[in-house]
Amino acid sequence: MQDEYYMARALKLAQRGRFTTHPNPNVGCVIVKDGEIVGEGYHHRAGEPHAEVHALRMAGEKAKGATAYVTLEPCSHHGRTPPCCDALIAAGVARVVASMQDPNPQVAGRGLYRLQQAGIDVSHGLMMSEAEQLNKGFLKRMRTGFPYIQLKLGASLDGRTAMTSGESQWITSPQARRDVQRLRAQSHAILTSSATVLADDPALTVRWSELDEQTQALYPQQNLRQPIRIVIDSQNRVTPEHRIVQQPGETWFARTQEDSREWPETVRTLLIPEHKGHLDLVVLMMQLGKQQINSIWVEAGPTLAGALLQAGLVDELIVYIAPKLLGNDARGLCTMPGLEKLADAPQFKFKEIRHVGPDVCLHLVGA
């Protein structure tokens, strides 16, 4: 039970980094000696010290003979920072309990082996499912090369997202929009379409003032990280004057052809081939995985939403349902042309249902 207690503490610490560690995983570490926590820490940001280093600094000499609980296998390679294995060995830690092995090919069991070779008692697998939930994006990218995709939808009770005129602000409540801000903040990137940019001219930023108090307490304003904004723009319709281009942080355009216009330095272009007359979404996701994008939060209209669903690229659906009816002339939730058989319909299962102000949020994962 003691091991579970300390690992649960390490997992809670790891959660604090979920807004800022991309493309790295979220990791927490707790060092215990004689039944007392003598050091703890978590990974804050890529390129900065890892969780083990923060915990060892706090523990000092007390780390000798202690047990280190870490949510992910300590690294054994030289990256932006030195190997954590070396730091644990040098500190004289007697035992290391890791929640899970690191799927990164540069680590993949080598860290645990190196610790064992140094005479340290090593085990792994404790609370592994909780640790995996904390790093869904990182794990999927390492295992498949694809980012983890969350599709956000907002709809009425009858599954409508906008009036026939296109009016959609606001179907859902201010509370739902605050909830979206929190989930945006945790994402590595936000994906939308040129159609959404032309229709709504969104900023697609994280606005710290709109985060709930609990999130603000964990995520100081000075640490605010803007997710990369990715726009699918096959026909180069978005202009440098659109708001999405003028916000802090990077904006990436997925295009099928070059664009010769002048853009700010924060704008980047990814050239993606076509498939059946449309930008190839599978190739796009493969390219984003190669660019170390762990997770993508999608906010777009029914066309892109439907295309992602039909391509089998969506890992999670987050659907906000407002208690209102828009009628059969209003626009539907997603467009999926050619879907004729029930057996071909994308399948999901409910993971969580919660109230968000007057609305309901449905959280679904792939079946």
Regions found by a protein language model. Name each.
Residues 2-22, 141:
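Short, basic/aromatic recognition patches
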Residues 10, 28, 75, 115, ...:
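Residue-level signal for inorganic ion chemistry
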Residues 27-35, 153-154, 362:
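Short beta-strand scaffold segments in enzyme catalytic cores
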Residues 31-130, 309:
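Zn2+-dependent cytidine deaminase-like catalytic core
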Residues 103-106, 129-130, 198, 237-239, ...:
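Short gly/pro/ser/thr-enriched loop/turn and capping motifs at secondary-structure boundaries
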Residues 140, 150-157, 161-294, 303-306:
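Active-site ligand-binding patch in enzyme domains
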Residues 310-348:
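Flexible, gly/pro- and Lys/Arg-enriched active-site loops
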Residues 337-367:
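Conserved histidine-centered catalytic loops in small-molecule metabolism enzymes
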